[in-house]
């Protein structure tokens, strides 16, 4: 898998087309994809890149959709999980994937400290599309960190985290 990941990482030779964001949770073998969202730049958006302006003032500029087409979804999420693990990312974050003109996915960047603003951050958007409430996203990140630290997750602590 490492050699395959390297061959597909940041392949900027071919023009990149579709913009995908993969939400991830967990650390190491426990890491999993929460879902994959596609970013669609509208006519009012900066077109070359997903700029700060596009992201922060997305209404009227950008639309988002949940990626569901197979086998693309499986390929994208497998690539994202492999990159997340290879980079040693932990607990929760986001990876950006682009598809080239042939439809091949390439890893572009990792955001292991992804924004968590429910009104304009990609990771909470992905969770909302997947039906995962915001408080559940935060709970999963905290539970991952507690498990990674080797601390016991008592029933009392679990209830406090969920509250």
Per-region residue spans from a language model:
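ATP-dependent carboxylate activation and anion-phosphoryl transfer catalytic cores
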Residues: 10, 14, 67-163
């Amino acid at each position: 898998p490492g050699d395959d990941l390297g061959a597909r990482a940041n392949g900027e030779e071919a023009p990149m087309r579709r913009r995908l964001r993969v939400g991830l949770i967990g650390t190491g073998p426990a890491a999993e994809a929460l879902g994959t969202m596609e970013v669609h730049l509208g006519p009012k958006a900066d077109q070359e890149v997903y700029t700060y302006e596009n992201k922060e003032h997305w209404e009227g500029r950008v639309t988002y959709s949940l990626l569901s087409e197979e086998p693309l979804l499986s390929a994208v999420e497998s690539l994202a999980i492999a990159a997340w693990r290879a980079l040693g990312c932990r607990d929760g974050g986001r990876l950006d994937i682009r598809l080239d003109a042939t439809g091949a996915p390439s890893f572009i960047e990792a955001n292991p400290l992804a924004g968590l603003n429910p009104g304009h951050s990609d990771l909470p958007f992905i969770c909302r599309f997947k039906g995962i409430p915001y408080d559940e996203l935060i709970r999963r990140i905290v539970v991952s960190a507690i498990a990674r630290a080797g601390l016991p997750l008592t029933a009392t602590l679990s209830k406090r985290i969920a509250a």
